[in-house]
Structures are given as C-alpha cells and as structure tokens.
Amino acid sequence: MNQVEIYTDGACKGNPGPGGWGVLLRSGPTEKALFGGALGTTNNRMELMAVIEALSALQRPCAVTLYLDSEYVRKGITEWIHGWKAKGWRTAARQPVKNVDLWQRLDALVSTGGHRIEWRWVKGHSGDPGNERADALANRGVDQALGRGALASAE
C-alpha cells in the first residue's frame, strides 16, 4: 500500500466570503499541489473541501497520514459523524448538521476509498512547513475565487 502524506488547509476572507482550499500531497520524492476556491463560502466548508479534494486525488488505496489544522474536520470525521449518521444527520441538539453535503461526500470517500487514514492535527500558523504550504495554496484558491484565475488548479 502506497504511503502518502497529505497537508490540507482552508481559508476564507470574511466568514462567509470568498474562500479557498489548498492541498499538498507527498509520496516519496513526489509532490503534488492542488488548490481551488469559491465565492460566498465559509472557512469550515473550505477546510472540508481541502480534505475531499485530497482524498479524491488518490488513484488507489493508500496508507495516508493527513495533517490538518481544523479540529472541526478532524473531530467531525473521527468522533461526531457516527452520532450524526445514527440521528439522521442531526446533532445531539437535534439540529441539522451544518455542511451535511460535504460531510456526506467525505464520509463516502473515507468509507469506500480503501484508504487507511491517520488524522493528525497540527497547530495552524505555527511554522509547520507542510501546513504553511497548504495555507499558501488555500490563499491562492481565494485569489482565484476573486477572479484572478481559474477556479481549480493543480501543479
């Protein structure tokens, strides 16, 4: 099983506002950077999109170490999602889960992708090189959403 390190980040200028997501994938000496953006979005939606786009980019089952600075996404996918699904995508307070469309996409990728994923939280803006790269890519996604380029790119 291929080993892959993934760093993801989301950014939003205003919340809601124009936002972007960034992904850095590493497998051995190979790196791939992805980014994209949207208007009228939130930071949490962009954090989720980064992880969705990262896992969607994997072409075969992998052993993934996924680094993210969003406790919302990490706890959501490792802890909260089980209760949400059992309650028909409602929270413990019986409210509809926010961003349910993205949570369902992420759940499908995690459940059916065949990946072994280790979710690792890193403190944002703390100097972690992979997280800093993902942050810079997310900000490029914001720029694209604001009309300074295409809406999704890979390099």
From Swiss-Prot:
Pfam families registered for this protein in UniProt: RNase_H
Domain (RNase H type-1): residue spans on this chain: 1-143
Catalytic activity line of the entry: Endonucleolytic cleavage to 5'-phosphomonoester
Gene3D superfamilies tied to this protein: Ribonuclease H-like superfamily/Ribonuclease H
Family the UniProt entry places it in: Belongs to the RNase H family.
EC number: 3.1.26.4
Described purpose of this protein according to its UniProt entry: Endonuclease that specifically degrades the RNA of RNA-DNA hybrids.
Record's keyword terms, sorted: Cytoplasm, Endonuclease, Hydrolase, Magnesium, Metal-binding, Nuclease
Cofactors that this protein relies on: Mg(2+)
Record HAMAP family: RNase_H (MF_00042)
Record text on subunit structure and interactions: Monomer.
PROSITE patterns noted in UniProt: RNASE_H_1
Predominant localisation class: cytoplasm
CDD domains (alphabetical): RNase_HI_prokaryote_like
Subcellular localization, as worded in the UniProt entry: Cytoplasm
Entry GO terms, CC: cytoplasm
Originating organism: Verminephrobacter eiseniae (strain EF01-2)
Broad EC category: hydrolase
Domain of life: Bacteria
Binding site for Mg(2+) 1: 9, 47, 69
InterPro entries from the UniProt entry: RNase_H, RNaseH-like_sf, RNaseH_domain, RNaseH_sf, RNaseHI
Gene Ontology terms for molecular function: magnesium ion binding; nucleic acid binding; RNA-DNA hybrid ribonuclease activity
Protein residues bound to Mg(2+) 2: 9, 135
Entry-linked SUPFAM superfamilies: Ribonuclease H-like (SSF53098)
Keyword Lipid biosynthesis annotated: no
Protein's recorded name: Ribonuclease H
